[in-house]
Protein backbone atom coordinates (compact mmCIF):
# COMPACT_ATOMS: atom_id res chain seq x y z
CA UNK A 1 0.00 0.00 0.00
CA UNK A 2 1.46 3.29 -1.06
CA UNK A 3 1.88 6.32 1.15
CA UNK A 4 -0.78 8.18 -0.85
CA UNK A 5 -3.29 5.33 -0.38
CA UNK A 6 -2.58 5.26 3.36
CA UNK A 7 -3.04 9.03 3.53
CA UNK A 8 -6.30 8.83 1.53
CA UNK A 9 -7.60 6.01 3.77
CA UNK A 10 -6.60 7.93 6.89
CA UNK A 11 -8.36 11.06 5.62
CA UNK A 12 -11.44 9.04 4.68
CA UNK A 13 -11.40 7.41 8.14
CA UNK A 14 -11.24 10.86 9.82
CA UNK A 15 -14.12 12.10 7.63
CA UNK A 16 -16.18 9.04 8.57
CA UNK A 17 -15.41 9.58 12.28
CA UNK A 18 -16.51 13.22 11.97
CA UNK A 19 -19.68 12.16 10.14
CA UNK A 20 -20.31 9.58 12.90
CA UNK A 21 -19.93 12.28 15.61
CA UNK A 22 -22.32 14.57 13.73
CA UNK A 23 -24.90 11.79 13.40
CA UNK A 24 -24.46 10.87 17.07
CA UNK A 25 -25.07 14.52 18.10
CA UNK A 26 -28.08 14.69 15.78
CA UNK A 27 -29.51 11.50 17.36
CA UNK A 28 -29.00 12.95 20.87
CA UNK A 29 -30.81 16.16 19.88
CA UNK A 30 -33.68 14.17 18.37
CA UNK A 31 -33.94 12.07 21.52
CA UNK A 32 -34.03 15.20 23.72
CA UNK A 33 -36.64 16.83 21.48
CA UNK A 34 -38.73 13.67 21.60
CA UNK A 35 -38.56 13.57 25.42
CA UNK A 36 -39.59 17.26 25.58
CA UNK A 37 -42.45 16.55 23.17
CA UNK A 38 -43.65 13.61 25.29
CA UNK A 39 -43.58 15.76 28.44
CA UNK A 40 -45.51 18.55 26.71
CA UNK A 41 -48.16 16.10 25.43
CA UNK A 42 -48.51 14.61 28.93
CA UNK A 43 -48.83 18.12 30.44
CA UNK A 44 -51.48 19.08 27.87
CA UNK A 45 -53.36 15.85 28.59
CA UNK A 46 -53.36 16.57 32.34
CA UNK A 47 -54.59 20.13 31.67
CA UNK A 48 -57.37 18.83 29.39
CA UNK A 49 -58.50 16.35 32.05
CA UNK A 50 -58.39 19.08 34.71
CA UNK A 51 -60.52 21.39 32.52
CA UNK A 52 -63.04 18.61 31.89
CA UNK A 53 -63.26 17.93 35.62
CA UNK A 54 -63.63 21.65 36.30
CA UNK A 55 -66.60 21.80 33.92
CA UNK A 56 -68.27 18.81 35.57
CA UNK A 57 -67.67 20.02 39.10
CA UNK A 58 -68.94 23.51 38.30
CA UNK A 59 -72.18 21.86 37.12
CA UNK A 60 -72.47 19.91 40.40
CA UNK A 61 -72.06 22.95 42.66
CA UNK A 62 -75.75 23.98 42.35
CA UNK A 63 -76.66 20.53 43.71
CA UNK A 64 -74.46 21.20 46.73
CA UNK A 65 -76.22 24.53 47.15
CA UNK A 66 -79.63 22.81 47.06
CA UNK A 67 -78.50 20.31 49.69
CA UNK A 68 -77.26 23.13 51.91
CA UNK A 69 -80.59 24.95 51.59
CA UNK A 70 -82.51 21.75 52.42
CA UNK A 71 -80.28 21.11 55.43
CA UNK A 72 -80.83 24.64 56.70
CA UNK A 73 -84.61 24.18 56.83
CA UNK A 74 -85.80 23.82 60.42
CA UNK A 75 -89.03 21.86 60.06
CA UNK A 76 -88.53 18.47 58.41
CA UNK A 77 -88.60 14.88 59.49
CA UNK A 78 -85.43 13.62 61.20
CA UNK A 79 -84.84 10.56 58.97
CA UNK A 80 -85.22 12.64 55.81
CA UNK A 81 -82.84 15.20 57.24
CA UNK A 82 -80.25 12.54 58.13
CA UNK A 83 -80.51 11.03 54.63
CA UNK A 84 -80.02 14.36 52.90
CA UNK A 85 -77.17 15.15 55.27
CA UNK A 86 -75.45 11.85 54.44
CA UNK A 87 -75.82 12.42 50.68
CA UNK A 88 -74.50 15.96 51.03
CA UNK A 89 -71.43 14.77 52.97
CA UNK A 90 -70.69 12.00 50.46
CA UNK A 91 -71.04 14.32 47.48
CA UNK A 92 -68.89 17.00 49.10
CA UNK A 93 -66.25 14.42 50.08
CA UNK A 94 -66.14 13.05 46.52
CA UNK A 95 -65.78 16.51 45.02
CA UNK A 96 -63.09 17.46 47.54
CA UNK A 97 -61.09 14.38 46.50
CA UNK A 98 -61.21 15.72 42.93
CA UNK A 99 -59.85 19.12 43.96
CA UNK A 100 -62.90 21.12 45.06
CA UNK A 101 -62.64 23.13 48.26
CA UNK A 102 -65.04 25.46 50.06
CA UNK A 103 -63.89 29.06 50.26
CA UNK A 104 -63.06 29.71 53.87
CA UNK A 105 -64.69 32.85 55.14
CA UNK A 106 -62.22 35.33 56.54
CA UNK A 107 -62.90 38.46 58.47
CA UNK A 108 -62.30 41.00 55.70
CA UNK A 109 -64.15 41.08 52.38
CA UNK A 110 -62.03 39.83 49.46
CA UNK A 111 -63.62 40.62 46.07
CA UNK A 112 -61.74 37.72 44.45
CA UNK A 113 -63.43 35.15 46.70
CA UNK A 114 -66.66 36.81 47.84
CA UNK A 115 -69.64 38.44 46.18
CA UNK A 116 -71.26 41.09 48.36
CA UNK A 117 -74.99 40.62 47.86
CA UNK A 118 -76.01 42.67 50.86
CA UNK A 119 -74.48 45.67 52.59
CA UNK A 120 -75.29 46.36 56.23
CA UNK A 121 -74.60 49.82 57.61
CA UNK A 122 -73.05 49.50 61.06
CA UNK A 123 -70.43 50.99 63.34
CA UNK A 124 -70.24 47.80 65.44
CA UNK A 125 -67.49 46.20 63.32
CA UNK A 126 -64.76 47.34 60.96
CA UNK A 127 -65.85 48.34 57.46
CA UNK A 128 -65.82 45.51 54.86
CA UNK A 129 -66.08 42.82 57.52
CA UNK A 130 -67.99 39.74 56.34
CA UNK A 131 -71.02 39.54 58.62
CA UNK A 132 -72.70 36.44 57.24
CA UNK A 133 -72.27 33.86 54.48
CA UNK A 134 -75.51 33.57 52.52
CA UNK A 135 -74.23 30.97 50.04
CA UNK A 136 -70.97 29.01 50.12
CA UNK A 137 -68.25 29.64 47.55
CA UNK A 138 -65.98 27.05 45.95
CA UNK A 139 -62.51 26.71 44.45
CA UNK A 140 -61.21 24.00 42.15
CA UNK A 141 -57.47 23.45 42.43
CA UNK A 142 -57.14 26.99 43.79
CA UNK A 143 -59.23 28.64 41.06
CA UNK A 144 -62.46 30.30 42.20
CA UNK A 145 -65.41 28.62 40.47
CA UNK A 146 -68.11 30.29 42.51
CA UNK A 147 -67.57 33.16 44.93
CA UNK A 148 -69.18 33.00 48.37
CA UNK A 149 -72.24 35.26 48.59
CA UNK A 150 -71.97 37.34 51.75
CA UNK A 151 -73.33 40.22 53.82
CA UNK A 152 -70.70 42.92 54.29
CA UNK A 153 -70.48 45.68 56.88
CA UNK A 154 -70.16 49.25 55.61
CA UNK A 155 -69.98 52.53 57.45
CA UNK A 156 -73.32 54.28 57.88
CA UNK A 157 -73.73 57.22 55.56
CA UNK A 158 -73.85 60.61 57.21
CA UNK A 159 -77.10 62.57 57.02
CA UNK A 160 -75.75 65.03 54.43
CA UNK A 161 -74.47 62.13 52.24
CA UNK A 162 -77.85 60.38 52.14
CA UNK A 163 -79.57 62.93 49.93
CA UNK A 164 -77.03 64.83 47.85
CA UNK A 165 -79.75 66.31 45.60
CA UNK A 166 -81.48 68.05 48.55
CA UNK A 167 -78.73 70.67 48.89
CA UNK A 168 -80.08 74.20 48.82
UniProtKB/Swiss-Prot annotation:
Keywords: Chaperone, Cytoplasm, Stress response. It holds the Pfam family GrpE. One of its GO terms (molecular function) is protein homodimerization activity. The keyword Transmembrane helix does not apply. It is found in: Cytoplasm. Its main location: cytoplasm. InterPro entries: GrpE (IPR000740), GrpE_coiled_coil (IPR013805), GrpE_head (IPR009012). SUPFAM superfamilies: Coiled-coil domain of nucleotide exchange factor GrpE, Head domain of nucleotide exchange factor GrpE. GO terms for cellular component: cytoplasm. Homodimer. Participates actively in the response to hyperosmotic and heat shock by preventing the aggregation of stress-denatured proteins, in association with DnaK and GrpE. It is the nucleotide exchange factor for DnaK and may function as a thermosensor. Unfolded proteins bind initially to DnaJ; upon interaction with the DnaJ-bound protein, DnaK hydrolyzes its bound ATP, resulting in the formation of a stable complex. GrpE releases ADP from DnaK; ATP binding to DnaK triggers the release of the substrate protein, thus completing the reaction cycle. Belongs to the GrpE family. This is Protein GrpE.
Amino acid sequence: MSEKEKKDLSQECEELKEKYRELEEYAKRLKAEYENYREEVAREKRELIKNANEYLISRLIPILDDFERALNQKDHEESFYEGVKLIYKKLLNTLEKEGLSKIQVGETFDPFEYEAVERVETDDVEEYTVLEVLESGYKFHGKVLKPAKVKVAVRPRKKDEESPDKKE
